[in-house]
Design a protein with these regions (language model features):
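Intrinsically disordered, low-complexity polar/charged tails and linkers
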Residues: 1-15
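Small-residue-enriched alpha-helical segments and adjacent helix-cap loops
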Residues: 2, 16, 21-162
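Glycine-centered flexibility motif
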Residues: 8-12, 20-23, 31, 90, ...
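Residues that form generic nucleotide/phosphate-binding pockets
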Residues: 77, 115, 119, 202, ...
Length: 227
């Protein structure tokens, strides 16, 4: 009698094509990692892998060539450094990106990215989604990265300790690329989590696996989806 292999995807782990080896993805909100955390990742890679780390286009890190028996210990080592992999793979809210490093006001964007990760990473209400769900935060429209996110947050105003964001949704790349569309304008930061939760509930309830949010928006139509 054969036993199905465990599904580690929600813990940020994929089985490699090479037999008996696994990849561990580590979420880094806004692509930021401390020196101490970087040392931990390097130590884990050297001790359990082949001493190399891959950097992803979404600001995460991947450690390859890991053995299944070592995965629990690796998870503990990463957690001690304040690092999480929960939701880095599979049908979950993936790592929160921010392509606006170095611009004025980036610390506030990084802080929001960390808030979003704390809220959604490992939150059972928003796991086992039809497909991955990507969120990005940007200081402006210049890089157009907000157009390829499931939810793109673009800073519209920041003064007097008040940050307002335009919310773009339903973008994505892949075989059928689609630009996101403007969903809501000038939303206060304190409402962002509630709005994303509402979008996720609609997505989870109406999108058939393995469809992304862009397919649901296309099926409903932008106006109907927004309503």
């Amino acid at each position: 009698m054969s036993t199905a292999a465990p599904d580690y995807r929600l813990d940020g782990i994929y089985k490699q094509r090479q037999d008996d080896f696994f990849m561990q993805r580590v979420k880094l909100p806004a692509g930021v990692i401390s020196a101490g955390q970087a040392r931990t990742v390097a130590t884990v890679s050297t001790r359990f892998g082949q001493g190399t780390v891959h950097l992803t286009t979404r600001g995460s890190m991947e450690i390859h060539w890991l053995k299944e028996k070592d995965l629990p210990q690796i998870k503990r080592e990463l957690a001690k450094a304040g690092l999480t992999s929960r939701g880095a793979c599979g049908g979950a809210v993936r790592g929160i990106t921010c392509g606006s490093q170095g611009v004025q006001g980036f610390p506030a964007l990084e802080s929001l990215a960390r808030r979003l990760q704390r809220h959604f990473a490992g939150n059972p209400r928003f796991e086992r989604l039809p497909k991955k769900f990507k969120i990005g935060i940007e200081a402006d429209l210049t890089g157009r990265r907000h157009l390829i996110q499931d939810v793109g947050l673009v800073l519209a105003k920041s003064d007097n300790n008040i940050s307002l964001f335009d919310i773009w949704i339903a973008g994505g790349l892949g075989k059928e690329p689609q630009s996101g569309f403007l969903f809501l304008e000038r939303m206060p930061e304190e409402r962002i989590i509630l709005i994303i939760e509402a979008i996720l509930r609609v997505y989870a309830a109406h999108a058939p696996p393995p469809k992304r949010l862009k397919f649901l928006a296309k099926e409903f139509g932008k106006l109907n989806f927004a309503n």
